[in-house]
């Protein structure tokens, strides 16, 4: 016999976790924009620069997610969305780091899976916020991630670095907007 969970308490716990960890979204925005700068500056280095840069980004992003999941975690254990996203990030970073000379198509698959799963998890988190601060921005970030994944898989060989840079620019800005909304809602 399981324990009954009040959906209202789940929403409140998730909202509080995001509000107290608003810095995690700001860090994710900084990381995304830092990779955009690297991709734009080192554009002509191609896949040789993209592979280690993405691996470092995936590890750093996963670390930010894991810290947010553990730090000030809700007592009812509702951090599984953040933990899952972090584990997917660590796996993507490890896959790329272990094989730095991955063929471009393999890198497309790793990036697409990482971004797609992260987008779906953002959408799942957003549906649980039930009209609270940041829900619309979180939905937008999730949709951008899912649409980027679809575009990436639809045309895997079409300008990976530029498409990734554009996606990360939008995703980074949305994370800053989300951090700002969550921080403002704490007052």
Label the predicted regions.
Residues 1-74, 183-187:
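N-terminal topogenic module of multi-pass integral membrane proteins
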Residues 92-101, 146-161:
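Hydrophobic alpha-helical transmembrane segments in multi-pass integral membrane proteins
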């Amino acid at each position: 016999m399981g324990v009954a969970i009040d959906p209202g308490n789940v929403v409140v716990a998730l909202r509080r976790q995001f509000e107290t960890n608003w810095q995690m979204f700001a860090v994710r925005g900084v990381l995304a924009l830092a990779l955009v700068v690297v991709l734009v500056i080192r554009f002509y280095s191609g896949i040789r620069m993209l592979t280690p840069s993405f691996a470092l980004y995936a590890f750093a992003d996963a670390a930010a997610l894991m810290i947010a999941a553990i730090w000030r975690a809700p007592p009812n254990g509702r951090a599984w969305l953040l933990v899952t996203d972090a584990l997917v990030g660590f796996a993507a970073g490890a896959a790329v780091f272990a094989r730095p000379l991955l063929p471009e198509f393999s890198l497309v698959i790793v990036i697409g899976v990482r971004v797609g799963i992260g987008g779906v998890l953002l959408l799942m988190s957003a549906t649980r916020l039930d009209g609270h601060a940041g829900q619309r921005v979180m939905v937008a970030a999730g949709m951008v991630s899912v649409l980027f994944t679809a575009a990436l898989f639809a045309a895997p060989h079409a300008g990976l670095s530029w498409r990734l840079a554009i996606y990360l620019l939008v995703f980074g800005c949305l994370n800053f907007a989300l951090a700002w909304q969550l921080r403002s809602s704490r007052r």
